[in-house]
Amino acid sequence: MTTTDTAPQTQPFQAEVAELLNLMVHSVYSETEIFLRELISNGSDALDKLRYEAISKPDLMEAGGTPKIQIVPKKAPDTLSVIDNGIGMDRQELIDNLGTIAKSGTKSFLTKLTEAKDGSNLIGQFGVGFYAAFMVADRIVVTSRRAGSTEAWTWTSSGGAGFEIAPASAEEAERIVRGTEIVLHLKPEAAKYLEAYQIERIVSAYSDNIQFPIELVPEEGEARQINSASALWQRSKSELAAEDYKQAYKSIANAFDDPAMTLHYRAEGRYSYAVMLFAPSTKPFDLFEPQRKGHVKLYVRRVFITDDADLLPAYLRFIRGVIDSEDLPLNLSREMLQNNPQLVQIRKAVTGKVIGELESLGEKDPENFAKIWDAFGPVIKEGIWEDYERREKLLALSRFTTTKGDNRTLKNYVEDLRDNQTEIYYLVGDSLERLKSNPKLESAAARGIEVLLLTDPVDAFWTSAPLDFGGKPLKSLSQGDVNFDLIPTTDEAKDEQPKPETDEALVIATIKDALGERVSDVRASQRLTASASCLIAGGQGPDRALERMLAQQNRGGASKPILEINLRHPLVAAIGRPGNADAADLSLLLLEQAQILDGELPEDPAGFAGRINRLVLRAL
């Protein structure tokens, strides 16, 4: 150890940590008690890591006693200590773990935390729960010794701009054989957390199912265990009540909401494993992070191995819980887990069970299923694109807003097909209101044809796959040809007005001449009944919605669209009048108004305004 290492040093916090600490120190959150849940959770993680490392290094467990967490309240001065004899931290780990946040999405998290009325759930979700202790403490001292090390270190902070790190005193180093001691110097208003009944209440509410004993160590008397320390997933369903599952979910998932779905079973046969999984009822803030990380923990015979083993496909990353295998070797590395044949089979089987449970919930408990779909529907639909094997099931599971209503299934859609209708029609956009008024719906509406209205960003991707449901292919109303000739219009939509005398070839030639290279083609529309024009994509390649999205992400430019025109519209008919001096302006306006109706801006806003002004002035 160098002289520099042994001398106390003051170091600044990473900018994001300083911002987070400022939020904690000046917290207005009502649930300040969650600090204890977070510290206990961190202690449990440290004990899990110790058990895992001890598989290959058994000597790590020789000193330090039975794995446990202790809570020690002391008055005068008011301090609350949370102690674990887990893996511990060395000097650099203290700096890295308590002085920085090495995670993507930090800025997004801090923004949401600043805006939240109660950020307690967000704090747990993001894994920065240690800093929640500054909601109740004006000074925190952390002393830690890594398992197998002879050195102990002390980290101290008052929640300001930085922290001090120094070697632990001889007395502290002797006291902490292995693990971490966190001493909170409580603010006056937080003194209630020194009361035994408060500590027991919080542990019962949030941490009862932590696998390790949690002991309350009073100033007088003996330490006593205050949690059940039971791996509930290893017990049979008949032994557990609904409240047990709620508490297990909150403990395993570090959550505050109640689960909208619970799946608990034991698989026996070629492989034996216990499963306890939950679907949350609220959406976590990091659902759409690029890493799409899962949240299912892998245990082997109750020993935590990893929470990063891709135990479910990415489109089920909202599922929380535990899979505990009886057969996997304890010393299997995290890297080897990815290709382990047992785990591949477990993943396949559990994925099928989760989808089956979602199907069952949709039929038996639509209200709870609606909570899941509202929060996680866009994520589940990623699987339609990614999981060919389960595509049909995921399509059947999906709920849609359509021109007939909300929460419609494709089964509902197929049951209500119009006579001679052979396709399932959809329209993709970024706004439900804009889609409802989209001119591409007009001919379908006149025939009573239901159309799926898709507004989630993922919809532009999964609909680009070749899809069918019940033998009926899915067809975009903004791409390729549409033929409704064999589907009669409804009585209400019948229009007895004669078609204007329009020279179709002349009109199309005039518009093409005016638009030049702006479009790939101009043609008469079967989609339109009232509007003058619309833009569509060709039959090959991506839908217009996907083209726009890819262009916004600089992942390719949009191809030239096709302009469809309604030959029955007076504006279109006017273009075909011989000698019409406004034909070029009208042709450009047909394109520009179609762009606006699709949510795009005209390429030349000044030119667009000039054309409008000229035509209005001529009409005065």
From Swiss-Prot:
CDD domains (alphabetical): HATPase_Hsp90-like
A single cellular component GO annotation: cytoplasm
ATP-binding recorded as keyword: yes
Single GO MF descriptor: ATP-dependent protein folding chaperone
Keywords, comma-separated and alphabetical: ATP-binding, Chaperone, Cytoplasm, Nucleotide-binding, Stress response
Localization per record: Cytoplasm
Keyword Nucleotide-binding: yes
Residue ranges, annotated region (C): 549-620
Pfam families membership: HATPase_c_3, HSP90
Region (B): 335-548
InterPro entries for the chain: HATPase_C_sf, HSP90_C, Hsp90_fam, Hsp90_N, Ribosomal_Su5_D2-typ_SF
Domain of life: Bacteria
Region ranges (A): 1-334
Quaternary state and interactors: Homodimer.
Summary of the function given for this chain in its UniProt record: Molecular chaperone. Has ATPase activity.
Protein family (similarity comment): Belongs to the heat shock protein 90 family.
The protein's name: Chaperone protein HtpG
Provenance organism: Rhodopseudomonas palustris (strain BisA53)
Lineage of the species this protein comes from: Bacteria, Pseudomonadati, Pseudomonadota, Alphaproteobacteria, Hyphomicrobiales
